[in-house]
């Protein structure tokens, strides 16, 4: 992401909140997903990229150590006043070695670990896939919770396959143990798979299950699907797309979302 695009995203948050900003509705620290800087880290290096993140005003990041040793990366972030409340894992690691996930999170000082993907055949996420995910998340989430870490599943749009009177995402939320498993709402993917008003619907329907949020907007006029993919140009500055940000932030805060991260 280019620097001016990040600034537009920050401005978009403020403009879309309008008078609600003055009422201090948006009280979250300004966070960013380090994936946003995926083109910077290999070229500029970790230290200079973290300098840019600090310069832009971010005080929290979500993500990995970008190839650097965990302790060294944590120190570089600490030196810049940047915390790492959430880091990532993948589905297979949760199955094979949840304690490795715990160790990494604790080294980084992360309270949350998010899993952003469930293996499946593209466009054909099934009940069997959802059932396996529920089992994996409940088992791994228990291990993480026993060690002071909260597992969050990050939705990606493909989970909105119809099921009974709702979707397979509904199935996953209802069948994961809320003591062990929470969720990270990616606003763009939630709209892409479920419709422009789906973020508000989910935050109202499951007000305590979402602990993290990716602040992303979907270009106006884009009709989503269930593939979990869309061209990069459909990711637009917050407030310029389909999201009703006043309502989303209001419901997020009311429901207990603890950290928000801009991502592009």
Describe every region a protein language model picked out:
Residues 32, 53, 61, 77, ...:
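Conserved, mostly hydrophobic/aromatic
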